[in-house]
Amino acid sequence: KIPENVSYDDAAAASMTLLTSWHMLVGRAKITPGQTVLIMGGGSGVGSFGIQIAKLYNCDVIATASPDKLDKCLELGADFAVDHRKEDWHKEVRAITKELAKKKGEAPGIDVSFDHIGETHWNKQLTLLKYGATLVSCGATTGYDAKTDLRHVFFKGTNILGSTQGTKAELEQGLYWMGQGKIKAAIDSTYSFEQAAEAHTKMLTGKGLFGKILLKPEGA
Protein backbone atom coordinates (compact mmCIF):
# COMPACT_ATOMS: atom_id res chain seq x y z
CA LYS A 1 0.00 0.00 0.00
CA ILE A 2 1.26 3.45 -0.92
CA PRO A 3 1.42 5.82 2.08
CA GLU A 4 -1.09 8.66 1.84
CA ASN A 5 1.54 11.36 1.47
CA VAL A 6 3.53 9.56 -1.25
CA SER A 7 2.42 10.56 -4.75
CA TYR A 8 1.79 8.08 -7.54
CA ASP A 9 4.74 9.60 -9.42
CA ASP A 10 7.08 9.02 -6.49
CA ALA A 11 5.73 5.51 -5.94
CA ALA A 12 6.22 4.67 -9.62
CA ALA A 13 9.79 5.94 -9.53
CA ALA A 14 10.49 4.00 -6.34
CA SER A 15 8.87 0.64 -6.98
CA MET A 16 11.86 -1.31 -8.30
CA THR A 17 14.82 0.94 -7.52
CA LEU A 18 13.93 1.61 -3.88
CA LEU A 19 13.31 -2.10 -3.35
CA THR A 20 16.60 -3.06 -5.01
CA SER A 21 18.60 -0.54 -2.99
CA TRP A 22 16.92 -1.45 0.30
CA HIS A 23 17.54 -5.15 -0.25
CA MET A 24 21.20 -4.50 -1.15
CA LEU A 25 22.04 -2.38 1.87
CA VAL A 26 19.64 -3.55 4.55
CA GLY A 27 18.76 -7.09 3.51
CA ARG A 28 22.11 -8.26 2.13
CA ALA A 29 24.91 -6.02 3.43
CA LYS A 30 23.10 -5.34 6.73
CA ILE A 31 24.52 -1.86 7.17
CA THR A 32 24.88 -0.44 10.66
CA PRO A 33 25.29 3.12 12.00
CA GLY A 34 28.77 4.58 11.72
CA GLN A 35 29.90 2.48 8.79
CA THR A 36 31.56 4.05 5.77
CA VAL A 37 29.51 3.23 2.68
CA LEU A 38 30.58 3.74 -0.93
CA ILE A 39 27.69 4.26 -3.36
CA MET A 40 28.84 3.72 -6.92
CA GLY A 41 26.81 5.58 -9.53
CA GLY A 42 24.98 7.83 -7.10
CA GLY A 43 23.15 9.58 -9.93
CA SER A 44 21.26 6.47 -10.99
CA GLY A 45 17.87 5.35 -9.74
CA VAL A 46 19.29 2.73 -7.40
CA GLY A 47 22.25 4.91 -6.46
CA SER A 48 20.10 7.88 -5.50
CA PHE A 49 18.09 5.68 -3.14
CA GLY A 50 21.28 4.01 -1.91
CA ILE A 51 22.63 7.36 -0.72
CA GLN A 52 19.47 8.11 1.24
CA ILE A 53 19.12 4.65 2.77
CA ALA A 54 22.72 4.70 3.99
CA LYS A 55 22.15 8.14 5.54
CA LEU A 56 18.91 6.91 7.12
CA TYR A 57 21.11 4.36 8.91
CA ASN A 58 23.53 7.11 9.99
CA CYS A 59 26.40 5.92 7.83
CA ASP A 60 29.17 8.06 6.35
CA VAL A 61 28.40 8.10 2.63
CA ILE A 62 30.80 8.57 -0.26
CA ALA A 63 29.01 8.68 -3.61
CA THR A 64 30.56 8.49 -7.05
CA ALA A 65 29.03 9.99 -10.17
CA SER A 66 29.86 11.87 -13.35
CA PRO A 67 30.87 15.54 -12.84
CA ASP A 68 27.43 16.98 -13.67
CA LYS A 69 25.75 14.86 -10.97
CA LEU A 70 28.05 15.39 -7.99
CA ASP A 71 26.16 18.34 -6.50
CA LYS A 72 22.87 16.46 -6.68
CA CYS A 73 24.41 13.52 -4.83
CA LEU A 74 25.40 15.91 -2.06
CA GLU A 75 21.88 17.38 -2.03
CA LEU A 76 20.48 13.88 -1.44
CA GLY A 77 22.67 13.56 1.63
CA ALA A 78 26.01 12.13 0.51
CA ASP A 79 28.83 13.39 2.73
CA PHE A 80 31.30 13.30 -0.16
CA ALA A 81 30.95 13.05 -3.94
CA VAL A 82 33.72 11.85 -6.24
CA ASP A 83 34.00 11.95 -10.03
CA HIS A 84 34.29 8.29 -11.04
CA ARG A 85 35.26 9.20 -14.59
CA LYS A 86 38.70 10.18 -13.34
CA GLU A 87 41.32 7.46 -13.73
CA ASP A 88 42.41 7.88 -10.11
CA TRP A 89 38.96 8.29 -8.56
CA HIS A 90 39.76 5.52 -6.09
CA LYS A 91 42.71 7.49 -4.71
CA GLU A 92 40.37 10.35 -3.81
CA VAL A 93 38.02 7.91 -2.08
CA ARG A 94 40.94 6.38 -0.18
CA ALA A 95 42.04 9.82 1.02
CA ILE A 96 38.52 10.51 2.30
CA THR A 97 38.43 7.23 4.20
CA LYS A 98 41.74 8.08 5.86
CA GLU A 99 40.32 11.37 7.14
CA LEU A 100 37.18 9.63 8.38
CA ALA A 101 39.28 6.97 10.08
CA LYS A 102 41.22 9.60 12.02
CA LYS A 103 37.99 11.07 13.36
CA LYS A 104 36.52 7.67 14.25
CA GLY A 105 39.73 6.12 15.55
CA GLU A 106 39.58 3.10 13.28
CA ALA A 107 41.29 1.59 10.25
CA PRO A 108 40.71 3.44 6.96
CA GLY A 109 38.66 1.96 4.17
CA ILE A 110 35.15 1.19 3.01
CA ASP A 111 32.86 -1.03 5.09
CA VAL A 112 30.24 -1.56 2.39
CA SER A 113 30.54 -0.89 -1.34
CA PHE A 114 27.25 -0.66 -3.25
CA ASP A 115 27.84 -1.58 -6.88
CA HIS A 116 25.79 -1.82 -10.04
CA ILE A 117 28.49 -0.55 -12.42
CA GLY A 118 30.45 -3.75 -12.78
CA GLU A 119 33.49 -4.33 -14.95
CA THR A 120 35.19 -0.95 -15.25
CA HIS A 121 35.35 -0.12 -11.53
CA TRP A 122 35.32 -3.56 -9.93
CA ASN A 123 38.94 -4.12 -8.90
CA LYS A 124 39.43 -0.54 -7.73
CA GLN A 125 36.48 -0.99 -5.39
CA LEU A 126 38.11 -4.10 -3.95
CA THR A 127 41.29 -2.16 -3.16
CA LEU A 128 39.28 0.29 -1.04
CA LEU A 129 37.64 -2.23 1.28
CA LYS A 130 38.57 -2.75 4.92
CA TYR A 131 39.32 -6.19 6.32
CA GLY A 132 36.05 -8.12 6.51
CA ALA A 133 34.19 -5.53 4.41
CA THR A 134 31.38 -6.22 1.96
CA LEU A 135 30.90 -5.51 -1.73
CA VAL A 136 27.28 -6.00 -2.77
CA SER A 137 26.40 -6.05 -6.46
CA CYS A 138 23.05 -5.83 -8.24
CA GLY A 139 24.14 -5.16 -11.81
CA ALA A 140 26.85 -4.57 -14.38
CA THR A 141 26.02 -1.58 -16.55
CA THR A 142 29.59 -1.28 -17.88
CA GLY A 143 30.02 -5.01 -18.50
CA TYR A 144 29.79 -8.30 -16.64
CA ASP A 145 33.25 -9.73 -17.37
CA ALA A 146 34.99 -8.21 -14.34
CA LYS A 147 38.48 -9.47 -13.52
CA THR A 148 38.94 -10.05 -9.81
CA ASP A 149 42.31 -9.80 -8.10
CA LEU A 150 41.70 -12.57 -5.59
CA ARG A 151 44.38 -11.22 -3.25
CA HIS A 152 41.94 -8.46 -2.30
CA VAL A 153 39.38 -11.14 -1.47
CA PHE A 154 41.23 -13.74 0.60
CA PHE A 155 43.80 -11.51 2.33
CA LYS A 156 41.07 -9.13 3.50
CA GLY A 157 38.34 -11.67 4.20
CA THR A 158 36.13 -9.78 1.76
CA ASN A 159 32.44 -10.63 1.44
CA ILE A 160 31.17 -10.41 -2.15
CA LEU A 161 27.38 -10.57 -2.24
CA GLY A 162 24.96 -10.75 -5.12
CA SER A 163 21.59 -9.03 -4.81
CA THR A 164 18.49 -8.77 -6.94
CA GLN A 165 15.14 -7.15 -6.24
CA GLY A 166 13.81 -7.90 -2.73
CA THR A 167 10.74 -8.77 -0.70
CA LYS A 168 7.33 -7.16 -0.28
CA ALA A 169 8.20 -6.43 3.36
CA GLU A 170 11.35 -4.58 2.29
CA LEU A 171 9.41 -2.48 -0.20
CA GLU A 172 6.91 -1.62 2.52
CA GLN A 173 9.75 -0.55 4.81
CA GLY A 174 11.18 1.71 2.15
CA LEU A 175 7.80 3.22 1.33
CA TYR A 176 7.19 3.83 5.03
CA TRP A 177 10.30 6.00 5.20
CA MET A 178 9.24 7.79 2.02
CA GLY A 179 5.97 8.55 3.77
CA GLN A 180 7.94 9.96 6.70
CA GLY A 181 9.84 12.27 4.36
CA LYS A 182 13.19 10.62 5.07
CA ILE A 183 13.61 9.23 1.55
CA LYS A 184 12.49 10.76 -1.72
CA ALA A 185 12.41 9.63 -5.32
CA ALA A 186 14.86 11.37 -7.65
CA ILE A 187 12.71 12.02 -10.73
CA ASP A 188 14.69 13.48 -13.61
CA SER A 189 11.85 14.11 -16.03
CA THR A 190 8.36 13.06 -17.08
CA TYR A 191 7.17 12.21 -20.59
CA SER A 192 3.86 11.26 -22.18
CA PHE A 193 3.46 7.92 -23.95
CA GLU A 194 3.69 9.79 -27.24
CA GLN A 195 7.16 11.00 -26.18
CA ALA A 196 8.42 7.51 -25.34
CA ALA A 197 11.06 7.54 -28.08
CA GLU A 198 12.45 10.82 -26.76
CA ALA A 199 12.53 9.40 -23.23
CA HIS A 200 14.34 6.28 -24.41
CA THR A 201 16.93 8.40 -26.21
CA LYS A 202 17.61 10.37 -23.06
CA MET A 203 17.90 7.18 -21.05
CA LEU A 204 20.34 5.63 -23.53
CA THR A 205 22.60 8.67 -23.77
CA GLY A 206 22.45 9.33 -20.03
CA LYS A 207 23.42 12.94 -20.67
CA GLY A 208 22.38 15.03 -17.67
CA LEU A 209 20.16 12.21 -16.42
CA PHE A 210 19.76 12.00 -12.64
CA GLY A 211 17.39 9.46 -11.15
CA LYS A 212 14.34 8.10 -12.95
CA ILE A 213 12.39 8.97 -16.09
CA LEU A 214 8.61 8.56 -15.88
CA LEU A 215 6.20 7.75 -18.69
CA LYS A 216 2.65 8.88 -17.89
CA PRO A 217 -0.59 8.30 -19.79
CA GLU A 218 -2.53 11.40 -20.74
CA GLY A 219 -4.60 12.72 -17.85
CA ALA A 220 -2.77 10.76 -15.17
Q: Where on the chain are the PLM-derived regions?
A:
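Mid-domain Rossmann-like dinucleotide-binding core that forms the NAD(H)/NADP(H) cofactor-binding site
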Residues: 7-87
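A general structural signal for well-ordered alpha-helical segments in protein cores
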Residues: 18-21, 90, 122, 150, ...
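Local beta-strand N-terminus motif with an aromatic residue
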Residues: 34, 78, 106-110, 183, ...
